[in-house]
Amino acid sequence: MMRILLFLATNMAVMLVLGIILSVTGIAGNSTGGILIMALLFGFAGSLISLFLSKTMALRSVDGEVITQPRNQTERWLIDTVSRQAQKAGIPMPDVAIYHSPDVNAFATGATKSNSLVAVSTGLLNNMTEAEAEAVLAHEISHISNGDMVTMALLQGVLNTFVIFLSRVIATAVASSRNNNGEETRSSGIYFLVSMVLEMLFGVLASIIAMWFSRYREFRADAGSASLVGKEKMIMALQRLQQLHEPQNLEGSLNAFMINGKRSELFMSHPPLEKRIEALRNL
């Protein structure tokens, strides 16, 4: 969950800055071809910057410490387990980090398979058995072997491009119609306002698509974990999460806005735990 939020937040920040630059400067403002070219350049800039900064940002956000030399049995077990799973998955050994948090959590990130990171919280190590933690680590290794961060970056780049392109094409049409009515002094202000509003609206739709893909890749990572360590261990890990985290915080916050049931899943980066368990049992 955290790695997705970090990625999307960075991407959104870059998109907002670039969008303001585009609107204020009027770059490619009247040319559909020019808008498309700039949308492609700026659209992928946000996602690629997020991708290449993901490892550094994730570590800093949790104040994680990469294990360079194991200092105790737990760190040795982590290194040995990740090394064994990475070898089985056919990927280079990722960096392994621990961060202090009561939350039961782990994440994988990094721009490439050869420059990746797996991090686990002390809460996970303290609340899960070795078998359960092993399954969680295998889940994160599967994210790396599947190239999920790169795929997410490419998808986000495409979505960014459409958001920028459509918002500015529509804004240009609205501003131009005002110009035809003789209100030329308002065109730049209207263009900026319309493009920003549409960018936010289309951005929400793009986020829904990105969250759908995130849920899809979680199912794939669960299946990857089952392949590496066996589905029973992954099921046990998910059942442990059910005991520790239900009701889910995200669902609770969405319920406060009267978004319930299947509609709430639109905004979730992970599928409901019961669906993940059911999918594993059906493997």
UniProtKB/Swiss-Prot annotation:
Cofactor remark: Binds 1 zinc ion per subunit.
Protein's membrane topology: Multi-pass membrane protein
Molecular-function annotations in GO: metalloendopeptidase activity; zinc ion binding
Biological process per Gene Ontology, one example term: proteolysis
Catalytic residues (UniProt): 140
Intracellular or extracellular location(s): Cell inner membrane
Keyword list, A-Z: Cell inner membrane, Cell membrane, Hydrolase, Membrane, Metal-binding, Metalloprotease, Protease, Stress response, Transmembrane, Transmembrane helix, Zinc
Chief location of this protein within or outside the cell: membrane
PANTHER family, alphabetized: PROTEASE HTPX
Family (UniProt): Belongs to the peptidase M48B family.
Protein name: Protease HtpX
